[in-house]
Amino acid sequence: MSADRACLKSYTACFAIRANAEPGILPRLIGLFAKRDLVPAAVLSRRFGDQQLAVDLQIDGIDRALAELIAENMRQMVSVERVLLADLPAELAGRA
């Protein structure tokens, strides 16, 4: 395995999304990964208030350019209010 590939596998892209609490929003968000043959390492969804949803998604081994593209696709969804993207070393994401 190349050094670049090993480094890529040691990082996790973390997406923090705030959206309207609509029934179809979770499958649409996760679908952005599925159509790229990616499976999230972690998904956490929390509803707050009557109409708000906070979603945290973590994806291991994704490069920054693809993560930014997916974040931009999320931002274009009507129900999505905000998307934050961060890179975490795998050990900080809870997986060593």
Where are these regions (language model features)?
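A conserved regulatory-domain signal marking ACT and ACT-like small-molecule sensing domains
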Residues: 1-96
